[in-house]
UniProtKB/Swiss-Prot annotation:
GO cellular component: cytosol
Catalytic activity: 2-formamido-N(1)-(5-O-phospho-beta-D-ribosyl)acetamidine + ATP = 5-amino-1-(5-phospho-beta-D-ribosyl)imidazole + ADP + phosphate + H(+)
Gene: purM
CDD domains xrefs: PurM (cd02196)
InterPro entries, per the entry: PurM-like_C_dom, PurM-like_C_sf, PurM-like_N, PurM-like_N_sf, PurM_cligase
Pathway(s) annotated for this protein in UniProt: Purine metabolism; IMP biosynthesis via de novo pathway; 5-amino-1-(5-phospho-D-ribosyl)imidazole from N(2)-formyl-N(1)-(5-phospho-D-ribosyl)glycinamide: step 2/2
Key word Manganese present: no
Subcellular localization, as worded in the UniProt entry: Cytoplasm
Species for this entry: Geobacter sulfurreducens (strain ATCC 51573 / DSM 12127 / PCA)
Protein's UniProt name: Phosphoribosylformylglycinamidine cyclo-ligase
Length: 348
């Protein structure tokens, strides 16, 4: 009797499961399409025909990011349909701060053993994020790597490319003393600070994923899995009618580390904390974890997802526009002169 030879499936890689997965995600991918997309899912590369006639001097802007340990929360709760939104948000929010309209997106999904239904839930979220951002999901990679991840675990990475007119690039160089700082509210923790949040909630407080968080009236899962807000359409709306001199996406590093990334030499940001009180989730984390103030503002977004430096005479109109766009926003401070060697963000 001839002994049966090994197959790839015997080694833990199920090509049939991969084909099932592709079939499940096709409608999600199609929902994100733009007229410039000239390829279908399954090709070796995604094709996007940029209409250069729309631009005088187009510059492509790229970004890549992940979701971090927020994925641990999704696995604990067995809820996988929102982390894809986070993935898109972390990438497109990074390029919109330079004024770039996101054009297309690609994802990387890695796991030990592919569960087609779970993977499809993730891609459904990616599709939703792309729709919110107005970009097309034109490709991706699904890597099944047996023995590399624990059962049920996976990781995500995202990649986006956008376009901006060279003359319209926002790089902070036009920020001047007296500019007002407009903060646009976050939807929650977004996708940063989860290692500390998990330590506080699950270790220090001893709560479970389905426990109701004190003072919030919602479960840990609901609070921690709130998707990251995508600011693309809001920012593009503002840029059509207002001068915006600099934008900071408040991600890992918080206000203290991200605002300086867009400040020119000689400028610092004065942030008035009474103008943007900590939302309840952040207050809970600070109190339960005895987290010092500066550590909070270096770890979490503390309720502010985007900071815009704008001319003083346009700040109030920008707030009115943001309110009309259903965004909570505040004037959280101003730009002041910074002496050499001084901190570039001052919390007052």
């Amino acid at each position: 009797m001839t002994k049966r030879g090994f197959t790839y499936k015997d080694a833990g890689v199920d090509i049939d499961a991969g084909n099932t997965f592709v079939g499940l995600i096709k409608p999600f991918v199609k929902a994100t399409s733009r007229p410039e997309v000239i390829s279908d899912i399954g090709g070796f590369g995604g094709l996007f025909s940029l209409n250069t006639n729309k631009y005088r001097n187009p510059v492509l802007v790229s970004g890549t990011d992940g979701v971090g340990t927020k994925l641990k929360i999704a696995m604990m709760a067995d809820r996988h349909d929102t982390v894809g939104i986070d993935l898109v948000a972390m990438c497109v929010n990074d390029i919109i701060v330079q004024g770039a309209e996101p054009l297309f997106f690609l994802d990387y999904f890695a796991t030990g053993k592919l569960d087609p239904q779970r993977g499809a839930a993730v891609v459904k979220g990616i599709s939703e994020g792309c729709v919110q951002a107005g970009c097309a999901l034109i490709g991706g990679e699904t890597a099944e790597m047996p023995g590399f991840y624990q059962p049920g675990e996976y990781d995500l990475a995202g990649f986006t490319v956008g376009v901006v007119e060279r003359d319209n690039i926002i790089d902070g160089s036009s920020i001047t003393v007296g500019n007002r700082l407009v903060g646009i509210a976050s939807s929650g923790l977004h996708s940063n600070g989860y290692s500390l949040a998990r330590k506080i909630i699950f270790e220090s407080m001893g709560l479970g994923i389905d426990s109701i968080l004190p003072g919030l009236g919602m479960s840990a899962a609901d609070a921690l899995l709130t998707p990251t807000k995508i600011y693309v359409k809001t920012i593009l709306n503002l840029l059509r009618d207002f001068h915006v001199n600099g934008i900071a996406h408040i991600t890992g590093g918080g206000l203290l580390e991200n605002v300086p990334r867009v400040l020119p030499n000689g400028c610092k940001a004065l942030v008035h904390l009474d103008s943007c009180p900590l939302p309840p989730l952040f207050s809970l984390l600070q109190e339960a974890g005895s987290v010092e103030r500066d550590e909070m503002y270096r770890t979490f977004n503390c309720g502010i997802g985007m900071v815009l430096a704008v001319p003083e005479n346009e700040a109030d109109e920008i707030l009115i526009r943001l309110s009309g766009l259903q965004e909570k926003a505040f004037i959280i401070g101003e730009i002041a002169k910074c002496e050499p060697g001084a901190e570039m963000v001052e919390l007052v």
